[in-house]
Amino acid sequence: MIEGSLGCPNCRDRFPVAGGFGDLRPPPRSTLDEVADVEPLVSPSAMEVAALLGLTDGPGNVALIGDVAGHATALAGLVPGIEFIGIAPGLRGWEEGEGVSRLTAGASLPFSNGSLRGVGLVAEGSPSSAANSSMAAELTRVVARDGRIAVWGAAGPTAGPAVREWEGALKAEGLDVLASEETAVVVRQVAR
């Protein structure tokens, strides 16, 4: 859908779609401020994102939250059959592209339980805050059995500690750690 709205059968609300970009935040929705377009990160690269999420082919859906969403178009070209769902307000100005969906969301992700093959994001702070702790639970909820969550540390001296705290929060949700480095952690959903 390029223009219009999506209706929710549960809450009966309507969510606007303009230029192919969905605003799936719960009401009351503030106006989306003008934000710069999300650009692909230098690190991690699109290839690293695909590798750490274990993506070689489709089908499936993968959420890319925040700055990692800048790789959505490149990843859609690298891994056919996967729909990459970029979740960031800075995607509003992007052109439509095959294999890429663009939206913004609130604290609850607009996906069914266990519906995603993977989720990638850059740690914006530590999960010890109430918001990020509930985000770890929300990521766990939406990832399918054997699906992966990859968290990269934001550039700078706080990258390592933030990644370690995210690792602890995701482990507390019952996820298995597949890889743990100073700048990234990858976990796998084993329950469902």
Residue ranges and their predicted role:
Residues 107-113, 129:
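Short conserved loop adjoining the S-adenosyl-L-methionine
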Residues 129-148:
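A short glycine-rich, Lys/Arg-flanked "PGG" loop and its adjoining helix->strand segment in the class I
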Residues 1-36:
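N-terminal auxiliary segments of SAM/dcSAM-dependent transferases
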Residues 58-109:
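Class I SAM-dependent methyltransferase SAM/SAH-binding core
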Residues 33-61, 68-74, 78:
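Conserved alpha-helix/loop element of class I SAM-dependent methyltransferases that forms part
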Residues 116-133:
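A short SAM/SAH-binding and catalytic strip from SAM-dependent methyltransferases
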Residues 98-99, 148-174:
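Conserved class I S-adenosyl-L-methionine
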Residues 168-192:
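Core SAM-dependent methyltransferase catalytic element
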